[in-house]
Amino acid sequence: MSKDEYKQNNQEKNNIIDNNSDEEEEINYNQLKGKPDTNFKSSSKRIQDNGHKLYIILEHANLELTKDKKNPEIINSDDHRNLIKKMNKSFEDFRPDVLHHCLLNLFESPLNKAGMLQVFIRTKENVLIEISPKTKIPRTIKRFCGLMGQLLQKYRIRAMNSSEVLLKVIKNPITQYIPFGCPIISTSEKSNTVKLEDYIYNLKSNNVAFVVGAISKGDVNIDYMTDTISISSFPLTAGIVCSKICTAFEKCWDVF
């Protein structure tokens, strides 16, 4: 397939997200944990893609709201240190900046701009989120946390002046949104190190899914992967792992 064919479905991105829409009824965060709206269907469920598609699943993301009913916020280790201490938890458990870094790298990649990337997030509270490739990720962590806080309360975020949904909470499990037979690869420092481009070529699959832990350190425990690999001899941040994966697929799939 030529480079032009890869890009023919890549439409101009809508860069404005409607953060002020009052169309959706606010939902208590306690109702959200692991219990997405049963009537809310994902547009990408059982995608049958005739071309190449990379699925990135960002696991164990640190997205948790404060209990303030009037103004709930995403808890982060910079602004809520006293709260985290009262919760008797580690500051490392509240790092939404790690997820933010991952998303910035993924959505600015040529692979995403070519329409060949689909991203999902699953939080440590087991909330599953689908993000449209057209979404413009906020540049600052403050705006990003505000956006994700609204999403966790309202289940979805729409584009400004459009009915198009850019971010939405969907039902578990994640595997129902990945094409049948698609390899699902997780990354771990403890696994055998591979040269990623060679590994991708040997998969011989148009659809591939990678699981990346959206955490500051350590591995994530999942039971749905088909293989686990290490992509570097050195410890890497989650954001750099996402960048390296996208770059490898861009080389293999001839995306410039």
Regions found by a protein language model. Give the residues of each.
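Long, charge-patterned amphipathic alpha-helical coiled-coil/hairpin "stalk" segments used as oligomerization
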Residues: 144, 170-173, 187-197, 202-218
